[in-house]
Curated annotation (Swiss-Prot):
It catalyses: Endohydrolysis of (1->4)-beta-D-glucosidic linkages in cellulose, lichenin and cereal beta-D-glucans. It comes from Bacillus subtilis (strain 168). GO terms for biological process: cellulose catabolic process; glucan catabolic process. This is Endoglucanase. The active site is at residues 169, 257. SUPFAM superfamilies: (Trans)glycosidases (SSF51445), Carbohydrate-binding domain (SSF49384). Residues 350-499 form the CBM3 domain. It comes from the Bacteria. It holds the Pfam family CBM_3. Its EC number is 3.2.1.4. PANTHER family: ENDO-BETA-1,4-GLUCANASE A, GLYCOSIDE HYDROLASE FAMILY 5 DOMAIN-CONTAINING PROTEIN. The keyword Signal applies.
Length: 499
């Protein structure tokens, strides 16, 4: 595929510098700053995570699954893909202590080191997670924790990328004052001998839900935050009330783990509840990390079974949870805007020379059905693999359940796939898009898919107000439009997304 000359020259210069033994600052191919280059050393101001200039920062990213089980997904290639395609600004390396983790197999720490080194090169933040779970009392392996964090802080004490999470989810017969706080004071003391200022996150009771207890008896370290964990299908307003209480007491919160599923990790997904949580976190500028990057066959996993371990994932490789999380990282304004998913929306690359034509099957301004008809044409000189191509029709669903029918397709309705995606933040003329994909087939130069006739309706068969929909316009004949966007493996190649 063709790339711009400027990008080619930039890549060539980076290659030559690397061959010459010189190290360039981490940056994207377009020369924009990475999250760490932009924000630098993090600290706490009141309840807010701030950058070196004292400006509020909201980090967003994803956590590994247990490194002893799914460590193959943690490598520079996968993290680079997550940075560039998902827009993550933080990655969490979840090193279980029990269940075949560090206590039984200390070599698993090498995967943590690999994650940190990759994050340093890529300019993203990284959380070193001492992932207690079945060993619910952090004091059970306190000396091992001190030994581990002594090593990590001695290695990375001068690295602004690093965040320490010293007790994932204390649970069982533990409480803040008697068990967790004394443990944290000892481990923090070990870290601070080597690292005076990087952020330290401390888990709270009841699987990191009792931030209210920590808020009433806070640690003295100036750069400590308190972990809040939730799973959207299980935890609701009662937990947000605890968070509000903690914030009112001046306790900074970091959501180092949350899932779209229920608390088991394998029930759901609960997207409406997830949206409610993300709206809340955005309103408070609370950083978050989603669980989890793996292909485990459970609903909280971001990837479908068998997905590549080194990135390069197509949208079809993502689970419902992964699709939602990626969309919501890309669809919000934070430090990730320096690492865009796609070229500028105003000037997308026309890599394959493909375009889309549209006509309205129902031109009524108010109708209980939306009936877009479209065809995709290959205007280029090379054959296009339709499995890599997706199209998005942007419109307003107004939080109603959506239904899809393919009435006719020259390439066969059985070859057309679809999904509805609700935007975390509505855009001009759209709170939802219909994404079409194709199971197989190719387009030779000059060829077209032919007519694809679609029909959408609300669950309750209520009317749509099409006149304000971004992708809609009234036309009885096929016309080229840039308000229906096309993507190659998730990368925008035709059209303009709504603002």
């Amino acid at each position: 595929m063709k790339r711009s000359i400027s990008i080619f020259i930039t890549c060539l210069l980076i290659t030559l510098l690397t061959m010459g033994g010189m190290i360039a600052s981490p940056a994207s191919a377009a020369g924009t700053k990475t999250p760490v280059a932009k924000n630098g050393q993090l600290s706490i101001k009141g309840t807010q995570l701030v950058n070196r200039d004292g400006k509020a920062v909201q980090l967003k990213g994803i956590s590994s699954h247990g490194l002893q089980w799914y460590g193959e997904y943690v490598n520079k290639d996968s993290l680079k893909w997550l940075r560039d395609d998902w827009g993550i600004t933080v990655f969490r390396a979840a090193m279980y202590t029990a269940d075949g983790g560090y206590i039984d197999n200390p070599s698993v720490k090498n995967k943590v080191k690999e994650a940190v080194e990759a994050a340093k090169e890529l300019g993203i933040y990284v959380i070193i997670d001492w992932h207690i779970l079945n060993d619910g009392n952090p004091n059970q392996n306190k000396e091992k924790a001190k030994e581990f964090f002594k090593e990590m802080s001695s290695l990375y004490g001068n690295t602004p990328n690093v965040i320490y999470e010293i007790a994932n989810e204390p649970n069982g017969d533990v409480n803040w004052k008697r068990d967790i706080k004394p443990y944290a004071e000892e481990v923090i003391s070990v870290i601070r001998k080597n690292d005076p200022d990087n952020i330290i996150i401390v888990g709270t009771g009841t699987w990191s839900q009792d931030v209210n207890d920590a808020a009433d008896d806070q640690l003295k370290d100036a750069n400590v935050m308190y972990a809040l964990h939730f799973y959207a299908g299980t935890h609701g307003q009662f937990l947000r009330d605890k968070a509000n209480y903690a914030l009112s007491k001046g306790a900074p919160i970091f959501v180092t783990e949350w899932g779209t599923s229920d608390a088991s990790g394998n029930g759901g997904v609960f997207l409406d509840q997830s949206r409610e949580w993300l709206k809340y976190l955005d309103s408070k500028t609370i950083s978050w990390v989603n669980w989890n990057l793996s292909d485990k066959q459970e609903s909280s996993s971001a990837l479908k079974p068998g997905a590549s371990k080194t990135g390069g994932w197509r949208l079809s490789d993502l689970s419902a949870s992964g699709t939602f999380v990626r969309e919501n990282i890309l669809g919000t304004k934070d430090s990730t805007k320096d690492i865009p998913e796609t070229p500028s929306k105003d000037k997308p690359t026309q890599e394959n020379g493909i375009s889309v034509q549209y006509r309205a099957g129902d031109g009524s301004m108010n109708s209980n059905q939306i009936r877009p008809q479209l065809q995709i044409k290959n205007n280029g000189n090379t054959t296009v693999d339709l499995k890599d191509v997706t199209a998005r029709y942007w419109y307003k669903a107004k939080n109603k359940g959506q239904n899809f029918d393919c009435d006719y397709a020259q390439i066969g309705c059985g070859n057309v796939t679809h999904k509805f995606v609700t935007l975390h933040k509505p855009k001009q003329g759209a709170d939802t898009y219909l994404e079409l994909g194709f199971k197989n087939g190719t387009l030779a130069p000059g060829a077209s898919t032919g007519n694809i006739q679609l029909r959408l309706h609300n669950d309750d068969w209520s009317n749509y107000a099409q006149s304000g929909d971004y992708s809609f316009f009234k036309s009885n004949t096929f016309k080229t439009t840039k308000k229906i966007t096309l993507y190659d493996q998730g990368k925008l190649i035709w059209g303009t997304e709504p603002n």
